[in-house]
Structure formats: structure tokens, C-alpha cells
Design a protein with these regions (language model features):
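Charged docking surfaces used in two-component/phosphorelay signaling
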Residues: 16-24
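Short hydrophobic/Thr-rich beta-strand motif most characteristic of the beta2 strand and flanking loop
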Residues: 26-33, 41
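Active-site beta3 strand of CheY-like receiver
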Residues: 45-51
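C-terminal output helix
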Residues: 107-116
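Conserved acidic carboxylate
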Residues: 9
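Receiver (REC) domain active-site loop signature in two-component systems and cognate sites
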Residues: 56
């Protein structure tokens, strides 16, 4: 059975890139368009990994990650922050919110798959 990855990303182009990349690598992808939908889909599907954009409407990725990590049923799901916020201190901010990894946009497909495989084992 292939691993399920929840992609929480408001930009359709970025979701499409990740959809193509993850499906070619043999992963199943679930999509959410904002942080609030991401929390709901995490609860519904219990994915093996969450790729979380940070800057989104409705609820940002930091808040969505905090809510996921506060839920005992979801706490163990690893979250990778995927963000264009590649400034000094942003990786630490993502870590403090509960993210288990960090990938800056734009990312190379090889870089993203390496991080996904590192986290999923």
C-alpha cells in the first residue's frame, strides 16, 4: 500500500507540480487549499506525511500545524513546511510551530523527494 501525503497549498500550480512529482514517485496525494481545510483533511484521512505551505488564506501553515500537533490523534504525523519564506529565522519559526522539516521554494524535484523519503523512511 502506498503512502498518503496531504499537500496543503493554496496555489494550483504548486499543487499540480507536487501532484505530478509525488504520483510519479508512487505516493497517493490528498489536496487541501488552505490551512483550515488542511486540518480537516488531516483528521479525515490520517496521512503518512503533510507538506504544508506557510502563507495561505483563511489559516496559515503555522496555525494549521499547531492545531494538527495539538490533536492527540494527529500529533505523530510529520509535517514539512514548504515555503517561499526562506529568510533567517523562518526555519526556526516553522520548527517552533511543530514542523518536522523545512523545504524552501522554489525547490528541485530531487530535493523534495529526498526530504519526503528522509521523513517517511
Amino acid at each position: 500500500m502506498s503512502k498518503k501525503i496531504l499537500v496543503v497549498e493554496d496555489a494550483e500550480d504548486n499543487r499540480r507540480i507536487l501532484r505530478d512529482l509525488l504520483s510519479m514517485a508512487g505516493y497517493d496525494m490528498i489536496e487541501a487549499h488552505d490551512g483550515a481545510e488542511g486540518v480537516a483533511k488531516a483528521s479525515e484521512h490520517k496521512p503518512d506525511l503533510i507538506l504544508m505551505d506557510i502563507q495561505m488564506p483563511v489559516m496559515d501553515g503555522y496555525e494549521a500545524t499547531r492545531r494538527i500537533k495539538a490533536d492527540p490523534a494527529l500529533r505523530a504525523i510529520p509535517v514539512i513546511a514548504v515555503t517561499s519564506y526562506a529568510l533567517s529565522g523562518d526555519e526556526e519559526k516553522a520548527s517552533l510551530a511543530g514542523c518536522d522539516g523545512y523545504v524552501a521554494k522554489p525547490f528541485s524535484p530531487r530535493q523534495m523527494l529526498a526530504k519526503v523519503r528522509e521523513i517517511l523512511g
